[in-house]
Amino acid sequence: MLSAPVGEGHVAAARVLAARMRELWPAAEVREVEGTGGPGRDRLLRSSYAVTMRIAPRLYGLGYDLLVAHPRVAEFFKAVAAARLGRALAPLVADGPDLVVSTYPMTSGGLAWLRRRGRLPGRSVAVVTDVAVHPFWVWADVDQTWTLLPASRDQARAIAPAADVRVAPPAVDRRFRPGDRAAARAATGLAPDAFVVLVTGGSLGFGGLERVVDAVLAGGAQAVVLAGRNDRLRRRLEARGLPAERLVVHGWTDRVPELVTASDVVLTTAGGMIATEALAAGRPVLFATPVPGHGRAGAEMTAAAGLALVCPTRTDVTTTIRGLIRDPAGMARLAAAAVDFGVADLDAALRDLAAR
């Protein structure tokens, strides 16, 4: 089970899959590797992603758009990355595992490189953790590619027509499922009658979250903020001294499933794993000023599927929240669509994979 410590979504999905495998196949040996085969490379990937998204997100978006718009450019960089990752991963698969699953795009490329050279005899699966599929996610030499939506599958097939691409259930923790909002509010200390918006910018808390919080508050909602590992953001928000009925701030916490269940709406600037988790829990998702690249692309595709709303500006955030507060029927429609998305059976997909 391969992932990489770039953000938290890739690792979170890998841990869920590994846990499910151990439950389904107790006699199997399941190994988890949270890295790309080189500590230095992992540090570079992690730090460069974090710095770029905080300081120059538009630069990240330009790079993303370049790969999507110019397939030949993407294929060149894919070939370089796959060769480097393949050589680094070779020792990890030297004992011939029966199944290798990857939740990180470049790691999947390394597996494809090994397969082409006859050095990966077992089955391989690439699990796409974003709704939007950029070229590095899809490799024809990987046995299966799992995507989240039919539109994601179609996008992946357009990138690599020879790839076996399927729509698969989201790899999310079992705790993200429709639950008792009143009980969750009691457990988390939130008022039963408040309109609660859970605000997150991913594990790194990026996406201009402070100003997004202002927009949420202007809409008349209580903002419950997940600052993640961004301690500076947490301290700045706490320093405002607002009463808890207006603003609650959490740093890194293991209570995210409870907080999602307690919320009326989950608002994210980053998209990715938290949006998938919210949908699995039956909560409406609001993409607010989504970050360039995968955030913006994923937001548009999720909204097109009827699973979310997109607010390009902070003014849109305020207007949309006011509208949702006044429109319980619209909220119910979004929640019902989310529940339909989350009912797919991940265990069944894994059993089917093992039977092939």
Where are these regions (language model features)?
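Conserved N-terminal ligand/cofactor-binding loop architecture of enzyme catalytic domains
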Residues: 16, 20-92
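Active-site and donor-binding regions of nucleotide-sugar-utilizing enzymes
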Residues: 65-156, 167
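A nucleotide-sugar donor-handling region in carbohydrate enzymes
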Residues: 143-196, 200-203, 228-232
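Donor-nucleotide binding loops and adjacent catalytic segments primarily
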Residues: 191-262
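Acidic donor-binding loop of glycosyltransferase active sites
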Residues: 261-269
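Catalytic binding pocket for nucleotide-activated donors in carbohydrate/polymer assembly enzymes
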Residues: 275, 279-321
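Conserved donor-nucleotide binding/catalytic region of nucleotide-linked donor-dependent transferases
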Residues: 309, 321-339, 356
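C-terminal alpha-helical cap of glycosyltransferases
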Residues: 340-356
